[in-house]
Amino acid sequence: MDVQVAPHASFVELKRLQLGDTAKKHRLIVLFFVTAVAQHGTIEMVRRLELVYFDAGGGHRAAAGALREVMEREHRPFDIQPMNLQELLDSMDVFRQLTGLRLQDVYNLMLKKGWTLGSPQLMMGMHLVIRRFHRKQVRLLEAHWRECRPDLVVSLVPNFNRAIGESLRRAAPGTPLVTILTDIADYPPHFWIERQPQYFICGSDRAVEQARGMGHAADRVLRASGMILSPRFYEMAPLGVEERAAARRALGLDPATPVGLVLFGGQGAAVMLDIARRLPDRQLILICGHNQKLRGRLEKMTQLPRRAPVFIEGFTREIPRYMQLADYFIGKPGPGSISEAVFMRLPVIVNCNAWTLPQERYNAVWVREQGVGIVLDNFRQVRRAVDQLLEPATYAAFRTATERQQNRAVFEIPELLERVMGGTDVG
């Protein structure tokens, strides 16, 4: 293990140790450690942390980035190295060999086109392919671990945790593996939770129950208060009444009329056209993500007479700001979007049906259980749902339910990782 002194423990300039006098150099090293211990009580050594993610859907990279940002701001004693699993496994990507597209690109294309009917069967097929190439995955990962020599591996990806765990036990026995679920619950088998020695960080009671039900000890199943959100959500200054009204006017919206935020992830979704058609008398902020074709179609459609204005946006990093200007959320039951909306106190309207990704179906159950919104069979019912949600008593109840959710997972997880690394009690 390459041991360094953490930056925030550097009380003596290390350049002073570049002296020709070896004895003086040794005395300065001793002085450095004595001073650090006297001031901090301990020396924190920087440990190499491999943060495993990929770009299927975008939420995994976003969670990894948010976690890294917070740990670096807090000067946690980790040398954080993001690792894109797709890039490591590119040489054996059977989907790329057959179609010219990476596995993550196939997934993103499905989301963009709405080709999600039958996705449970597709996932079963994907698991068969993953198992078929399991040994090769393990060899590639094992070589990577031997080269980079991590002190802690943190996985933010599903499907591949068995290969990650097996390869790590071979290359670096005793190195902890922590899987952070970026879904509200697991979708067994072989999605997030595997039967192998490791830690899990779960953002819901349901996920904790699933991990414990798989035989994992209580001290290996750690509870965070929700999904990982960007720290920007916590940094947004509240808007005053006049400030919020002015910001709405700048988007061409009426400050005195409710606004719905329509968001279907980074790729958008064609169903947004249908939602906009069915809500001609509702003000909407429509976020299209990277889907330029969808944006063009929405802009063309909204040039037709409407009884209420809309604002159309492409890919943006200003989701927290747009959520501040909205009163409710409409979208798919993705764990990230739901969690962001609830954090911003927006009641949600989501759908759940045969087209819903299987790993996202429990999220609709969670919405109902927590009382934070309305779940539809399909968005043909969206007009009635918006009318129901905006009834004063109903809206107040949903808002109160969102306020009961106190999600600070992105700040809790670094402490949990540090305790795992230190071998201290994390239960």
Segments predicted by a language model, with ranges:
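Active-site and donor-binding regions of nucleotide-sugar-utilizing enzymes
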Residues: 113-215, 220
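Short hydrophobic beta-strand element within catalytic cores of glycosyltransferases
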Residues: 329-331, 347-357
